Amino acid sequence: IYKTDTFFYPSQASESSRRAFGEAWPARAREIVTASVDLYLQEHWGSALDAMRCDTHDAAPVSKNLTEKQRQAVKDKFTAVNLAFDLCEKGGQKTWRAPFLETAETLRSAVRDNVCVAYTQFYLRYKDSGFTKKHPEKYIKRSPEEVSLVVEGLFGGRS
């Protein structure tokens, strides 16, 4: 967050910053911001994103005729995703603040575009698959709407 915040405004490139740092500075600062956002996503959401990745060739809902091994794989995916959201909510990310509104919105947008989209597809693909015969609430803890609410509250967003 610090790196993203530090380089966001210089990337807007006023004439004085171009004179001071050279013509290539604004592009370099934007690269640093992008790399910092990507690093944040990988560090804090990477395992959840990996678990949510579906076969891109077939995003259709899964049939209800899953084998025991397939059911366990889906349970493991939901467990990994839930852990990432639990860490976000209870591990402090909800209280992190970005001093500049633009930085906060850049980070929220990255989470929205990556995590929320992936979760919605993941949820729709598996929610009715019958992967758990008892206690689906143990695995399906959040709806896509609830995930979006969590994301909108990150980095000083709405409470």
Where are these regions (language model features)?
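Extended alpha-helical "rod" scaffolds
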Residues: 1-159
